[in-house]
Amino acid sequence: MMVFQSFILGNLVSLCMKIINSVVVVGLYYGFLTTFSIGPSYLFLLRARVMDEGEEGTEKKVSATTGFIAGQLMMFISIYYAPLHLALGRPHTITVLALPYLLFHFFWNNHKHFFDYGSTTRNEMRNLRIQCVFLNNLIFQLFNHFILPSSMLARLVNIYMFRCNNKMLFVTSSFVGWLIGHILFMKWVGLVLVWIQQNNSIRSNVLIRSNKYKFLVSELRNSMARIFSILLFITCVYYLGRIPSPIFTKKLKGTSETGGTKQDQEVSTAEAPFPSLFSEEGEDLDKIDEMEEIRVNEKDKINKDDEFHVRTYYKTVSENLDGNKENSNLEFFKIKKKEDHFLWFEKPFVTLVFDYKRWNRPNRYIKNDKIENTVRNEMAQYFFYTCQSDGKERIAFTYPPNLSTFFEMIQKRIPSFTREKITSDQVSTYWSLIHEEKKENLKKEFLNRIEALDKGGSVENILEKTTRFCYNEAKKEYLPKIYDPFLHGISRGRIKKLPPFKIITETYRKNNIRGSWINKIHGLLLKLNYHKFEQTIENFNRKSLSIEKKLSFFSEPQQEEKFNSEEEIKIFKFLFDIVRTDSNDQTLIKNFIDFHEINKKVPRWSYKLISELEELEGENEENVPMEPGIRSRKAKRVVVFTDKEPHDEIYTNLKENQNSDQKDEMALIRYSQQSDFRREIIKGSMRSQRRKPVIWEFFQAKVHSPLFFDRIDKLFFFSFDIWGLKKKILKNFISQTKKKNFDKKEEEQSKIEEKRRIEIAETWDSFLFAQIIRGSLLVTQSILRKYIILPLLILIKNSVRMLLFQFPEWSEDLKDWKREMHVKCTYNGVQLSETEFPRNWLTDGIQIKILFPFYLKPWHKSKFQASQKARLKKTKDKGEKNDFCFLTVWGMETELPFGSAQRKPSFFEPISKELKKRIKKLKTKSLVVLRIFKERATIFLKVANEIKNWILKNFIFIKGKIKDLSKRNPISLFGPREIYELNETKKDSIIRNQIIHELSVQNKSMEWTNSSLSENKITNLIDRIKTIRNQIEEISKEKQNLTNNCTKLRYDSKKIESSKKIWQAFKRKNTRLIRKSIFFFKFCIEQLSIAIFLGIINIPKITTQLFFESIKTILDKSIYKNEEKGEKKKNPFYFISTIKNLISNKKKMSYDLCSLSQAYVFYKLSQIKVSNVSKLKDVLEYNICITSFFVKNKIKSFFQEQGIFHYELKNKTFLNSEVNQWKNWLRSHYQYNLPQIAWARLVTQNWKKKINKDSLVLNPSLTKEDSYEKKKFDNYKKQNFFEADSVLNPKHNFKKDYIYNLFCYKSIHPTENFFDMYVGIALDNCLVSSCLEKYNIRGMREIWHRKYVDWRILNFWFTKKVNIEPWVNTKSKKKYINTKVQNYQRIDKITKTDLANQKSFFFDWMGMNEEILNHRITNFEFFFFPEFFLFSSTYKIKPWVIPIKLLLLNFNENINVNKKLTRKKKGFIPSNEKKSLRFYNLNKEEKESAGQFELESDKEKKRNPESALLNQEKNIEENFAESMIKKRQNKKQYKSNTEAELDLFLTRYSRFQLRWNCFFNQKILNNVKVYCLLVRLNNPNEIAISSIERGEMSLDILMIEKNFTFAKLMKKGILIIEPVRLSVQNDGQLIIYRTIGIPLVHKNKHKISKRSKKKSYIDKKIFEKSKTKYQNKTVNRKKKHYDFFVPENILSPKRRREFRILICFNLKKKTARDRNSRFDKNIQNLTTVLHKKKDLNKEKNNLINLKSFLWPKFRLEDLACMNRYWFNTTNGTNFSMIRIRMYTRFPIH
């Protein structure tokens, strides 16, 4: 039952998948998709369905629907029917049909009475309206849809059309699918309209029911035709923007096809048959149309013979091959004559109106310097051709075009080559059988190898080493090695790249006239008349191949296979029969000296365009005198210097140093700051068809892709970023609490100002006639300022001074006025001169710069009036202040062009300051007078106080007497009386007081006799106080009652109360003032009297003090004047003093010597020009102690003076330079404190033994093996190295000797890290500054940013070698230490003969100059073997390894001395070392160390070492060098060989690019601006000094020296050298390399050491060592499981991948689970390779099985390998496996 259910389920799934992948379902799906391509035709259809009513409306609906369906049916038929597709697919067809019809329809709707003839009921088809509705829907359906573009659907349909067999069924089903989708869409629209009509909520709306709405609806219904006409007009304009207009677009002038050379019209198929030099957005329709015409109408066929041409290079000779002069032109050059006769008749009318060869689309024009016109990219990215895929013949869209053309050529040329048509089933079965057989063979071989390995066979025999191309598997017959594509290295030989044909000289021809070889394939394809010669079959020359082996690209010594002579003849019978030409006939040999190339004529654009920028620069004036065809960024050519009338002295000097072809003017290109909308498009192309920019605003400043819509500052209602809004609010809230950062504000303000300035400049530049208006205004403002305004101001100022009885300042003002200069500048601010205007200044713009602007001053101070402090402040302000400005249109001044106006110094500001100072002085003087008066008036105050006290005493006495008299007469008859008008409350209080007073008086009178006077007083007072208290309490109670009764006071009462309070307060203050005024007057009188008396006393004291101060100031002025004169004589410019200060500061700098190497120290010691080196040499050589008795006293005293040794410490021996001491010094620095692994990798084998033995080794810097010998010191002394002679400059040498000795001492004593360079000398071209200034921090990691090193640190010579190994890998994850040496970086040894025989030749760094002809620029070994990329990558990471000056100045190479001998001696060197280093091996010591190379060199010696190939190489090299030198001399006359060599290096071998500093760029521009002005001035001293003071001109970049090298520029930090990856040349060798290079990467992983190789891939010694070394680990396999081999690694990488692919693909179309069913049975046998089943438990066994036998069939890298091999895609980045997904997994029936 379960089986039955699974069977039913499987059938259902398969049935469903078949239905889904059927043609009908896919067609329905694509048809349904096209329903959503809503175009303008839907407007007419909806209009007919919605608006029209009645009988005529139904007829219109029917006609609209009919036309709509008919138009869509035409579109679907055009997919299958090619003529209809050609008619509708061309752009001019739509233009001719659509635009006139749109205009007709527009006028039809506007003027109905012209076309309305009325309607007849009998024959409605005569009604023109119904016919127009049908035509509208039919024609508009053919237009391009604009909501969902039909181009995407068309591409999908076209792709599917190639895949399916029943194409008509697919078209029909797609049309049915569209019809179903259209019916559903219309039904949905009808339902929506019915819902709107029936919805009460919409109909019951107040607005809809209003009369106004009804009126609007009726108007809308009446004007619907007008609205549709407007919409159609907009659509018409929209299409006009996207369709090229035949009249208004710009026509380009095409170059004549016959005018170019043959090289311009043809391109080699070997380089690129259809190179994508021109990137189009869409396919070229013309080529597709032609292909479809050929496919559909098979009658018209292109003659294939006319497509292919042969490109030959030879000299014209008197006789042809067969001796007939009439047949001198070959047959394949007769094509042009046929085309000329029928050229006019073949051109249709359309091409006269529409130039189909023009760029109508906004494409980019990509230049190709090698050819004249660019190749038309007519194939997009696909090339269609039939091929076998999965056993079936399919159309592949990524087929290699080279193979297709080659296959067609073979089909034409070989008549016997016919293909039998086989059915698809036979092909698939045959294909599957072949691959099944291959898989079985591979499986058997694989299992046999595993069994052999399990039995204990040798690894060398089991591993598969090579893969050969076998064309007969039964007999195991292979292709020859030289033509086997699976092989590489010396067996393939080396194909030499011939030089350009102009350089081939007669000597080269003579050396090569030994007979030429013609391949039989070339003879078949080229159809040459060589069959008339005698054909002599010669055996294959093995010697030529063996010689070629030496120059292979990836050379590896491989074991040769021997063939019998009969087998060789069979192999070469068809392909390699060699035709020997007549050796006596020299003319024939000359014709066949050069090679023949198979070419195919490719279509080219008939235009050679230049850009507007090139026209401005004037580079292509001679070559292309046409107008530019490419729109560049808006730019203007500004001439900044013209040398029309040079001075005689300057001109003669310039003439000697300059070439004759030097231009007399210098111009700069000024670019516009606006956003560039044109984007380098071609003139006449439609800008609206650009893909990326989308315009969604009314005015959009910058056009960009909608991809970056989220980064735009959008409006609030467009932005939905709530989190960003929260962040902004929080940020503002937090920023309020924090302090404001003023630096950021200033920076933002400057950015805003700069942006505003650029906007103003662009607005002036964009408007018409704006520059003319601005220029005229600037010139008038300049004249007004200079000659009218400023002289008037001077006149007014001096006249006012004369009126105020002061001396006028005519001379000072006129001097400042004359100093002001109005310099005319370009629009960017480049200065020209006062009188010379820039060229085309009215159109290009002008700036006027004012130097030393005049400011009116109220007075001029004397030079010695200010103090020294004020003068220093003034100079400081002057340095910061700019003494120039730019003039604006309004007469204002700005610091930068179009900047904001500056504030002028005020005329009245110094006057106000002076007044304030004087007022302050008066105040201080008055205060002093008052103080003195106060001090002196104390005496008078004492007297006044005594008088005052006496008067008061007398007054008190008189007052007491008066009181006594008043007591006796209490009732006063006379007294004043006051009358008041009081209110009721006050009257009551007065009455009560009177009553109380009367009572008291009565009591007094009653008790007069009984009590005394004092007692009565006290009692009376007590009683009065009590009564007053009681009254106060009563009054307060009354007030409370009143307030309770009246809650709200009136406004008048409040006003009265407030006025009362104010009056009372004023009364109190007034009484207080009256009371205290007496004391105030007294105080004033006292102060005045004191001041007067003090002033009188101190008058003589003040006068004497002023007298002494005036004398002192006069003396100070005179002293300061003398000092100033002395300073002027010493330092005329303050900037020179700053330079001196910098130099003096450098002397005091301290440096750390911890990073100095011992080699550097002793090398510097070797350069000392005095004889003190011998003392140190004697001590170091004999290794004696300085305290011994055998050392001379002179040597002891020398070392004691130098501080190396102190003689008093007798127990301390001399710190000699043995390795032990040197090790101790190294251990003190952590960068040298390396582990044992690193030391094992850093040193050679001899050093390893010494380190393991812990023995002392002598100093490596003085041994013969590593560095400088005794003899080399003499050679160094002979060389100058740009130093002064020791005899002429002894003082300099003495100082240098001292410093170098100090270096030696500091290197031996590392504890003292710093020293002071108090000796005033700059070492060897700023040696200290360049090498040591950044070394005061220990550790090399912190100085990796350095880009230059002093070249004198180590003098490398790349001709002999010393071993130093880079790329040390100290990371070891495994338990053992791998001490094998992978590679070596070669550094030189110097011998006497080399120094004596040095000859300046081409630059030979990294072997670039050896075999210049054959050496390609791109070294492809570095891409797959990064460990070989020694110098460039090492230098990139560690720039202190190789000095920079060496890269540019060491051009010495010993080439011509015994070249034949060196070639014999050098033997065989693998090409990877040869390519990267190019060194010769001449030393005996290295011959012994590299003895394994001699095995190959002995083999080469046995053969003919001086063969024709080496001679040919030598001759070509020499001739090429001579021709290159002649070429360079004709172009440019160099001053020295160094300049010529450097130019050759930079142009041809520039592996490093030079980049200057970003700060240096601005300095250069500023200097150029100043130079342009200084050149035109007669006396430029003042301007030069002021520009240096302002910082406009930089002295550090001035080229003062004549021979200024690149190394010095790099030392200054101006130029920076950077490694750069070179561009790839797509030539034939690259294609061959890419096809072969993939297996080489995997094979290289098995390589261990280049030195220890013989013939195999695995070194026996290392393998045996590893076996013995790790035997104890690998014997017990239970404990440790080392996967030394994954079993599939037994096969070669290519066979391994083939095996995987054959297993992964189901050849017999089984289910996925049965793919590896056969192979799974053998998995159990594979476990015996490494382990036995007895010794393993289940978990480990499963783990190893999982690890070893997880076949990577689903890995991406394997898919990429399949992609590379099967689909001809060599670039991994363009991963085209995605295209495979376009084919469905299941077959289509």
Swiss-Prot record:
GO cellular component: chloroplast inner membrane
Coiled coil: none
Subcellular location field: Plastid, Chloroplast inner membrane
UniProtKB keywords: Chloroplast, Membrane, Plastid, Plastid inner membrane, Protein transport, Transmembrane, Transmembrane helix, Transport
Database matches in Pfam families: Ycf1 (PF05758)
Signal peptide: none
Topology of the protein relative to the lipid bilayer: Multi-pass membrane protein
Gene Ontology process terms (BP): protein transport
Transmembrane segments: 19-39, 68-88, 91-111, 133-153, 176-196, 227-247
Function of the protein: Involved in protein precursor import into chloroplasts. May be part of an intermediate translocation complex acting as a protein-conducting channel at the inner envelope.
Family statement drawn from the similarity comment of this UniProt entry: Belongs to the TIC214 family.
Subunit relationships: Part of the Tic complex.
Note: There is a partial copy of the N-terminus (positions 1-341) of ycf1 in the inverted repeat (BAF50246).
Protein's name according to its UniProt entry: Protein TIC 214
Organism of origin: Capsella bursa-pastoris (Shepherd's purse)
Organism lineage: Eukaryota, Viridiplantae, Streptophyta, Embryophyta, Tracheophyta
